[in-house]
Amino acid sequence: EKIRDCINSVLWADEIIVFDSGSTDRTVELAKKYTDKVYVTDWPGYGPQKQRALEKAVKDWVLSIDADEQVTPELRVEIDTCLEDDPKAIAFRIPWAVHIFGKRLDFGRSGRAPLRLFKREGARFSDAQVHEKIILPSGKIGKLEGRLLHFSHRNMLQALEKFIQYSWLWAQQRHEKGEKTGIANALLHSCWEFFNIYVFRLGFLDGRRGLLMAILFWQYTFNKYASLWSLNIPVKK
């Protein structure tokens, strides 16, 4: 749905690599208009899929973005500058500018700055099914000022479906590692997530959408831990 805008925002890159996991829209067709490095594979999870893409890269630096994200012209200039001016850095965090239901949020979830720009050598993605991490060798990690646009939720149905999928994947992943939790713990974590987004990260300054985002993540966090709890309930025959 947003692949064209995503790729257009990074056309200045020396190489563009696109991985598709069997989408049924025109994603592959559109992507091939911009790069010949388009790969269609199965879906092993977010971490393994991004590791596959990383292994195809040949340039020194990698910018990892999802199809619902875009690089602003200002961020592009800053990226070019920082790679020249800070030779000791091995990676950079980039602040998000989350868009929800057609409006940008400047606080709350937009207060996060995920690690997205990094040196390829020695880097790898974790094997997490969801909420994957970039694992780096020791070194300096900087933070940019420009924002990475993130069009995360186009409507309420899409947001709820995404949160349900992510919470279940997270629970399965933790269950496989032998982790356990309880309903009280689910409530504690979800309340903390709400206050973290709405109060500590100033989500209340984003108005009604800021409140809605905090509530959605309260629900999402509760569902994660409640799902993990449910997976550990003995099945009675």
Locations of the language-model features?
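Short, well-formed alpha-helical segments that are part of the catalytic scaffolds
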Residues: 1-12
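Catalytic-site signature of metal-activated, phosphate-bearing donor transferases
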Residues: 48-54, 61, 65, 72-237
